[in-house]
């Protein structure tokens, strides 16, 4: 009997320790997202993904790549073939024609001087987006395809709150301790099983790779350079179509229509680029605006859970507490003994003679 009482006492102490641990783990899971401003950061992540989603499709990326090829072909033919040919017809050297364009059409002159560099920078953005398409698609499923990133906070608060409440009930009502341990263990199983079921580890790894790849794009200097490049190309495109070509046509004693025919026949890449230039410049401006408007969203998203930023860290901050709950709870259920049993004492029977005394 003494051994039974000792075992019951040991089991009771073990249960209380485990229940106390459940409360502590639950408090950690509940406080963590609030302390790290996860609601605000996850909302910023959702805004970022929503903004970029239309631009990270196969069709959108293919269009961006086509724009890049069109502009590259136009720039190469313009600088290596068309301008030298026009210089010859105008009885100028290429250097003289360049000086003439710079003096009379400054936007065209500035644009031509920077064209290859600007094209290279936008090509870098296009390459980054294309290379990160797969990572984006995975990250866009955090936590699941039907739950938005803002639900990440609830994935901490709900299990954390349950662990605190169930653990507190078990501590306050010793007779319910075993049942509360079983329920908290079930919470841990749901957390761990849920993370594994939705492949959260691979999704968060993809998110970290994407965040790292886009860091140079969202750097302050890069964003400012994108805006300057876009303004340069917009001004060049407008002045080239509206002023430069008509002026050259006049100098060559041609009508604008004749000049257009000449360009189409002899410089098809330039003609194709000129025809598509308004749409290409518009898409370029859209890309620039996309980056500019999401700098703050990116910075907040990249700081999950804290300044150094790592979605993988956030995954482990959910997985480790879940595993601890499962291990501690299962251990208490296995080694903590069964339910308390009330010992039954034998009741002595009365002797027959005692009834007659």
Q: What does each of the following model-derived ranges do?
A:
Residues 29-152, 197-318:
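Extracytoplasmic/ectodomain regions of membrane proteins and secreted proteins
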Residues 2-26, 151-199, 312-357:
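Juxtamembrane interface at the cytosolic side of transmembrane helices
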